């Protein structure tokens, strides 16, 4: 018998990857506006557990951010 006050535990729904799907944006090193959404206010790449980006797309995203930094499109450090 279940207790009267017992509740189901809360399960947070897993977010889906923003780069998968029909009309998802393409990861491009020239799209600095898109890349800035995945860089913290200190200039670090935000981990996928926070942004819910899949592992494959996170590697692509990190590569694009690093390429944009090298070409001067994104800053390495934001002060």
Swiss-Prot record:
Function: Binds as a heterodimer with protein bS6 to the central domain of the 16S rRNA, where it helps stabilize the platform of the 30S subunit.
PROSITE patterns for this protein: RIBOSOMAL_S18
Pfam families in the record: Ribosomal_S18
Entry-linked Gene3D superfamilies: Ribosomal protein S18 (4.10.640.10)
Family: Belongs to the bacterial ribosomal protein bS18 family.
Keyword presence, Iron-sulfur: no
The keyword RNA-binding is annotated on this UniProt entry: yes
Subunit structure: Part of the 30S ribosomal subunit. Forms a tight heterodimer with protein bS6.
Post-translational modification: Both N-terminus methionine truncation and retention have been observed for this protein. May be methylated up to 6 times, on undetermined residues.
GO CC term (a single one): cytosolic small ribosomal subunit
GO molecular function per UniProt: small ribosomal subunit rRNA binding; structural constituent of ribosome
Descriptive protein name: Small ribosomal subunit protein bS18
Gene Ontology biological-process annotations: translation
HAMAP family the UniProt entry points to: Ribosomal_bS18
Keywords of the record: Ribonucleoprotein, Ribosomal protein, RNA-binding, rRNA-binding
């Amino acid at each position: 018998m279940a207790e009267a006050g017992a509740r189901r535990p809360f399960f947070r729904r897993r977010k889906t990857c923003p780069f998968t799907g029909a009309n998802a944006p393409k990861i491009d090193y020239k799209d600095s506006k898109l890349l800035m959404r995945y860089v913290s206010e200190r200039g670090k790449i935000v981990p996928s557990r926070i942004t819910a980006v899949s592992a494959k797309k996170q590697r692509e995203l990190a590569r694009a951010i690093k390429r944009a930094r090298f070409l001067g499109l994104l800053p390495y450090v934001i002060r």
